[in-house]
């Protein structure tokens, strides 16, 4: 690590900006690829319940590789780990373009994403510290959500024009992310020299799980972020089903526009969290989490496009304000106890287990014929109750 990298902890340093650009392109590819592949499934006449299964194979890769990716992120320069991971995403997207089964290609993208996540968040704690870390997380989330905004819309719009063109655009985005990773300064590995025996890595990972779960602050963060991202990915698929039922619109683009409104809102909410919430005042984000569920239930009852846009914008704002402080809390506390890479890998296990569970329940509800509006109302109410229970639990733990 160069001395300049050691001392320059500004969130506008060359290293931080390189990370943000690489993250934007990688997240753009992820989101465009999802909607392009969903369009491909439609053209190949897959049933509706198979759509969430596509995301389930993606998150299944996260869960399967969770014991190993944290150590990989901490054992090598994180910028190089990000580059290899984006290379795997590129291979998966290119495979789908060339006719590989979309579920197989998307699984490969999931493996790349699993390796990428601990490195992309872990590197923030190596490039900046303290309350700047909350701001860096806000910048990372804003970049990610901008990519979700543009990637989702690009994927849907291009797929309406030509599905293969949309898939090629995704592959090009991943290629750009690989190139951007080359400009990230090569940092010293956080925890080199660890054992690479699978049994030892598995024990080390589950030991990190235990350490983080026993700490009240990190347990609170793990549960909160798991609930949020599990709900978020389910909402994306709910929109695909809800739009033709509630609005009578059957194209690929409209669900992506609605998802984009959530993305815009998260950018605003993330910025507000960076200014209003510190590591010492994380509990300020909890009312926003409860309101997410309430607004989702109200949204599900809409039958016009304009109020749907407004409510999804509000859901995004609440979501950004809710999740950014929880991410920063876990990174700061986790870095000191088990290493940033391991902390994020444990977080990924929790988030993706929640996604797998929620997507499985959603797919089952669709399979048995539950109406989309009823799914949305039930989903919102249950989410609000879950966050309220988490807040009560956290306050009781803090009082002991």
UniProtKB/Swiss-Prot annotation:
Q: GO CC annotation: what is one?
A: plasma membrane
Kindly list the GO molecular function terms attached to this UniProt entry: lysophospholipid:sodium symporter activity
Q: Does the keyword Cell inner membrane apply?
A: yes
Q: Which residues cross the membrane?
A: 19-39, 53-73, 91-111, 139-159, 164-184, 195-213, 227-247, 257-277, 281-301, 304-324, 352-372, 373-393
This protein's membrane topology, according to the annotation, is: Multi-pass membrane protein
Q: Where does the protein principally reside?
A: membrane
Q: Known InterPro entries for this protein?
A: LysoPLipid__transptr_LplT (IPR023727), MFS (IPR011701), MFS_trans_sf (IPR036259)
Keywords from the UniProt entry: Cell inner membrane, Cell membrane, Lipid transport, Membrane, Transmembrane, Transmembrane helix, Transport
- Give the subcellular location: Cell inner membrane
* PANTHER family hit by this protein: MACROLIDE-EFFLUX PROTEIN, MAJOR FACILITATOR SUPERFAMILY (MFS) PROFILE DOMAIN-CONTAINING PROTEIN
Write out the similarity annotation. Belongs to the major facilitator superfamily. LplT (TC 2.A.1.42) family.
- Name the job this protein performs: Catalyzes the facilitated diffusion of 2-acyl-glycero-3-phosphoethanolamine (2-acyl-GPE) into the cell.
Q: Report what the protein is called.
A: Lysophospholipid transporter LplT
Gene symbol of the encoding locus:
lplT
